[in-house]
């Protein structure tokens, strides 16, 4: 901030930055936390008003009449007298802009010309419209803008556009005013896509270079199989682009799984051609004969896989939305791999394959001996099982039982909790606690958080409850940005440590929670539990039952940090007017 006041910074961000960001393509909403816009604050003096017999309605009426922006009209417009030389627009004073101007508003005029001005019955100052909330970054007053993309927007593109726009706007910023992107949810998306890209490259190397080379033992055969991968993946991305999908975590995860599938059909074709060539056929005849024999099985295996993935793309509801891109990506990759195996792979076999030598190279002999040992052992095991069918049946039933038991006993959930690089803390003071008390407690919490080596930045917003989206002087929330993933422990470990430290602040209830795995699905991870008073119980009885539920829920090892922000003990003042005295 430097020499700039928090009020100026907040108002500048609201009027000069917020609207510019809201106009960017893909931006759905720009929300300002702790906003303090400029406003003329008029503090009435009841003693002076009573002495002059002036009411609040009189003052409100004077403000409405004398602080207006309206057209004053024109002079010299037709019909006019002959000889009119000019037509002029009349400009009035319009809306008032400073405290002195508001002080000159005439509230009442007397019969002898005496005037009662607003400054005679009120104290006027330029301040904020509301002081009920505030925002700070690492203890410094700041303007906190939250930017939410539209449902169909690409979050990474929106983040890039926002940074570019802020860079452009920075040239017009006053001195001592700067901007920083401290809370960036796309950092997790970018890191995830990067990790998927690394996994994609490693999978490609492991599957093609290592596994295929080990078993095919020919660089020509390995090259033919390897060429099937980029062709299938390029075709898959083309279909995804045509359908309006993007390269996101779901589609890229499906691509990784598809890598092992797109080479299956190509390997089958190459092995079949090599077998025919070993029988004495030339490359062209071997390819044609192999294709006649395996075309049907290749198509059949593709249809079996499609029978698994296509129905997933048709699931209704939010589950269907989540898995649709995943299923479409896999189905497309499998289909294209089958097409490649029946077209490109045979053509490459006819051009590149050579008959295998009678004796494999020395580098492969050790591997072949081990493979033969495993194959012979497996054959003997199958032979024994065939002679004892009841044993095979028992083993199959036991395996099925283990699967069913695991499915029943394994914990179930909609989506796993992700380490997105940040978490929240909800601060709740006793009901009717002032904003000053709330900010003092949040300052203590901030200092504790910044001492944690895993924490990078802390943004605090007082006077706003993030869980229910309401303004309250006794509440606030803290956004805790963590350092890079490889520089700190996992999210759950950091939250557990922080939660233990924050519980040492007795003035407030502070609960940490992770963000939802999918943006837009609530404000926190986990689930909500609603308690309904169906028999007309009082708020006090409902609160008692709620706390009983909380105590019981926190005893379960599967649950942690179960809490509520609701309370029935809200202190209030009751004003009783003595109507007889007021009428005198």
For the regions a language model picked out, list residue spans one by one.
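Surface-exposed amphipathic alpha-helical segments in non-transmembrane regions
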Residues: 1-38, 57-74, 89-130, 153, ...
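Flexible, glycine/serine/threonine-rich loop segments and coil->beta-strand junctions
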Residues: 36, 49, 81-85, 136-140
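Interdomain boundary/hinge elements
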Residues: 73-86, 207
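Hydrophobic regular secondary-structure detector
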Residues: 131-497, 501, 505-508, 513-514, ...
């Amino acid at each position: 901030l430097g020499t700039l006041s928090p009020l100026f910074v907040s108002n500048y961000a609201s009027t000069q930055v917020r609207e510019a960001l809201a106009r960017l393509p893909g931006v759905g909403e720009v929300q300002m936390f702790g906003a303090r816009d400029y406003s003329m604050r008029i503090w009435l003096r009841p003693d002076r008003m009573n002495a002059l017999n002036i009411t609040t309605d009189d003052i409100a009426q004077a403000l409405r009449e004398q602080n207006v922006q309206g057209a004053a009209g024109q002079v010299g417009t037709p019909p006019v007298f002959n000889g009119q030389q000019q037509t002029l627009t009349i400009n009035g004073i319009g809306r008032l802009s400073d405290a002195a101007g508001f002080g000159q508003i005439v509230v009442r005029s007397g019969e002898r010309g005496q005037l009662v001005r607003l400054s005679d019955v009120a104290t006027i100052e330029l301040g904020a419209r509301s002081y009920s909330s505030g925002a700070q970054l690492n203890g410094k007053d700041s303007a906190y803008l939250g930017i939410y993309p539209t449902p169909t927007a690409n979050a990474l593109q929106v983040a890039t556009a926002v940074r570019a726009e802020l860079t452009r706007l920075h040239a017009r910023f006053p001195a001592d005013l700067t901007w920083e992107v401290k809370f960036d949810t796309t950092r997790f998306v970018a890191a995830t896509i990067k990790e998927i890209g690394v996994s994609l490259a490693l999978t490609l190397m492991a599957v093609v270079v290592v596994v295929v080379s080990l078993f095919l033992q020919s660089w020509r055969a390995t090259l033919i199989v390897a060429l099937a991968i980029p062709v299938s993946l390029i075709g898959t991305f083309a279909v995804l682009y045509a359908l309006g999908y993007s390269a996101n975590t779901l589609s890229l995860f499906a691509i990784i799984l598809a890598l092992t599938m797109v080479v299956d059909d190509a390997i089958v074709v190459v092995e079949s051609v090599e077998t025919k060539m070993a029988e004495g056929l030339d490359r062209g005849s071997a390819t044609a004969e192999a294709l006649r024999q395996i075309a049907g099985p290749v198509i059949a295996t593709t249809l079996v896989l499609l029978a698994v993935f296509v129905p997933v793309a048709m699931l209704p509801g939010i589950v269907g939305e989540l898995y649709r891109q995943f299923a479409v990506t896999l189905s497309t990759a499998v289909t294209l791999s089958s097409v490649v195996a029946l077209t490109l792979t045979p053509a490459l076999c006819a051009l590149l394959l050579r008959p295998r030598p009678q004796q494999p190279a020395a580098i492969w002999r050790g591997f072949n001996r081990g493979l033969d040992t495993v194959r012979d052992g497996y054959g003997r095991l199958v032979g024994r099982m065939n002679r004892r069918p009841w044993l095979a049946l028992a083993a199959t039933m036991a395996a099925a039982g283990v699967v069913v038991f695991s499915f029943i006993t394994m914990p179930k959930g909609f989506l796993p909790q992700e380490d997105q690089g940040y978490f929240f803390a909800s601060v709740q003071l006793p009901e009717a606690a002032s904003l000053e008390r709330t900010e003092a407690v949040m300052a203590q919490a901030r200092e504790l958080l910044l001492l944690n080596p895993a924490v990078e930045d802390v943004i605090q917003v007082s006077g706003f409850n993030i869980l229910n989206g309401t303004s309250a002087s006794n509440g606030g929330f803290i956004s805790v940005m963590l350092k890079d993933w490889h520089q700190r422990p996992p999210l759950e470990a950091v939250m557990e440590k922080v939660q233990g430290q924050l519980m040492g602040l007795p003035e407030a209830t502070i609960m940490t929670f992770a963000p939802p795995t999918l943006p837009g699905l609530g404000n926190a991870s986990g689930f909500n539990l609603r308690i309904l008073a169906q028999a007309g119980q009082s708020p006090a009885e409902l609160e008692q039952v709620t706390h009983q539920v909380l105590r019981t829920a926190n005893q379960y090892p599967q649950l942690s940090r179960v809490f509520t922000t609701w309370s029935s003990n809200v202190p209030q003042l009751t004003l009783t007017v003595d109507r007889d005295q007021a009428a005198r």
